[in-house]
Amino acid sequence: MEMRLNAASIWLLILSYGATIAQGERTRDKMYEPIGGASCFRRLNGTHQTGCSSTYSGSVGVLHLINVEADLEFLLSSPPSPPYAPMIPPHLFTRNNLMRLKEAGPKNISVVLLINRTNQMKQFSHELNCPNQYSGLNSTSETCDASNPAKNWNPWGTGLLHEDFPFPIYYIADLDQVTKLEKCFQDFNNHNYETHALRSLCAVEVKSFMSAAVNTEVCMRRTNFINNLGGSKYCDPLEGRNVYATLYPRKPAIENNLETVHTNEKFILVTCRLDTTTMFDGVGLGAMDSLMGFAVFTHVAYLLKQLLPPQSKDLHNVLFVTFNGESYDYIGSQRFVYDMEKLQFPTESTGTPPIAFDNIDFMLDIGTLDDISNIKLHALNGTTLAQQILERLNNYAKSPRYGFNLNIQSEMSAHLPPTSAQSFLRRDPNFNALILNARPTNKYYHSIYDDADNVDFTYANTSKDFTQLTEVNDFKSLNPDSLQMKVRNVSSIVAMALYQTITGKEYTGTKVANPLMADEFLYCFLQSADCPLFKAASYPGSQLTNLPPMRYISVLGGSQESSGYTYRLLGYLLSQLQPDIHRDNCTDLPLHYFAGFNNIGECRLTTQNYSHALSPAFLIDGYDWSSGMYSTWTESTWSQFSARIFLRPSNVHQVTTLSVGIVVLIISFCLVYIISSRSEVLFEDLPASNAALFG
């Protein structure tokens, strides 16, 4: 009977303990409520650290809503219960306001929340006025005049993307979450400010601790030292993949058992930027800052493929390259130039001969097309080639046959836009590099708000065949003023000019780029990767995500989905159909099996491949990190990003709790001392039978 009672007591104790734990978890869940969002994070270069970080255990601040600029004065002039977490709408997220909060220091400001209230927003760009200003033609001077809005490439830039903040900045896009934060502020914080220190307040905790500090040189040294001992990393180089393809398949490097470099092989190099960036992790589509140029680039490639004969020994080849990491001092193009100098592009694994600078006739770099109807042709020097290409472009742009009604102007000077061509001109100012760029009109350059709305994109979703070229007078599916038609017009003009350059004959046909492909392309990259164009360029039955691909360069092991989709896309659009090859035999590259527009599957001979987009600075032993020769950007490692709101006890409550705890601790020590010193009196000796029973 006694044993049963003991067993029952043990089970009761276990159940009571379990109930206590369960109750504790429910209480915790009621105390904290998670808030979804995106965090600012830390990046470093050879001389500085930029971005944000929380404290190791997380940064906590009392919520305070900023409706007008004057509301900041409360936080900056002896607030009653610091630290605070201001909730700032985009139109007040300015350089002046953020630098004032930074100067207030972590004593008063511990967190900044950017809330998605855009009704008063007119601009939002936190890139520099001169992007990549120290990595252009001459690393010791700026590539544009940052002090003169008429002479810089981002007049609305605040430079906050390149500042270092002593507190985390957290972006909250979901309006339901924003409403929840505002309600919590109104219910608990927005009254009786003089008594803030005496009562519980609604607060937020943000965890976004960054491991890296100081600069890339220090961080890489610490990382390499720790790795030698088997530890973890503090930072990683920004690293990705360039994607390239040729118009025609190339001859193999080995002929008759001899390795040959084809010095008579000539290319026109057509390039664009693949990546974009923002202040916040995983947010930012780069619709106007780079996607417009990428769209024109893709359509030029496809139109040339359709207009030119499938094989020709006499015609120039065209090398199409999308560079990754250009937002960070031209990582992709710097590595491309470095590899070409060393005759390491393409790699030996491709089985094709290396391409040298002597193989390149000229480069046409498609830059930022903010105003896609107002484009300039830029060149460092006014060469005969530049004048010739300009005349050909305008010949088609102004031709009544096509009705494009565009006028492409030119500028031949060192005032060049921040595009990949600068990496080539930096090596050799006499290199034949031409740049197509529009005047800057993007008020959301490198920001979270450079999205489909910023370029006025509306998906037509026609379900028609986008792989066929269209007649120039076909306006059935899309409005002539639509973005898709503007992409059609510009890409057709460029492709026609290149067609004439390659063949030596003027283009007289009526076929132009298909605006429906532009419709699908923009939908894939701005709204959903689960789209007809990506499906056609993938293996049959591939499962695609319903989110647009991330185009930030990231690090080794990070997301490279934009490079992957670009690889498939260029492979599909520049390939040659092989109708006689069955699916089972279409397995070894360069053969590739695609779903195709009808999703029935088709074997194609492809020319696309990857090249490494990692700065040469990380390959050179003893590199001088402050030299400015190559990009030195790295990204800090972190463990987690999270945010949650809760009621923070008042200062008086915290002091009272601490005091009670200290008193209880002292009393406990006293009781233990008394019991220990009087143990002979308080505890009698056990009877012999009990002593034997309990050992």
Curated annotation (Swiss-Prot):
From the UniProt record, give one GO term of the biological process aspect.
Answer: protein processing
Q: Which UniProt keywords apply?
A: Glycoprotein, Membrane, Notch signaling pathway, Signal, Transmembrane, Transmembrane helix
Query: What is any Pfam family matched here?
Result: Ncstrn_small
Does the keyword Glycoprotein feature in the UniProt annotation?
A: yes
Indicate the secretion signal residues: 1-22
Where in or outside the cell it occurs: the entry states: Membrane
* A GO cellular component entry from the record: gamma-secretase complex
Instruction: Point out the glycosylated residues in this chain.
Output: 45, 108, 116, 138, 381, 461, 489, 585, 609
Topology in the lipid bilayer: Single-pass type I membrane protein
UniProt entry tagged with the keyword Phosphoprotein: no
* Cytoplasmic topological domain: 676-695
Topological domains, Extracellular: 23-654
Segments passing through the bilayer: 655-675
Q: What does this protein do?
A: Essential subunit of the gamma-secretase complex, an endoprotease complex that catalyzes the intramembrane cleavage of integral membrane proteins such as Notch. It probably represents a stabilizing cofactor required for the assembly of the gamma-secretase complex.
Family under the similarity heading: Belongs to the nicastrin family.
- Subunit note: Component of the gamma-secretase complex, a complex composed of a presenilin (Psn) homodimer, nicastrin (Nct), Aph-1 and Pen-2.
This chain's protein is named: Nicastrin
Q: Which organism is it from?
A: Drosophila melanogaster
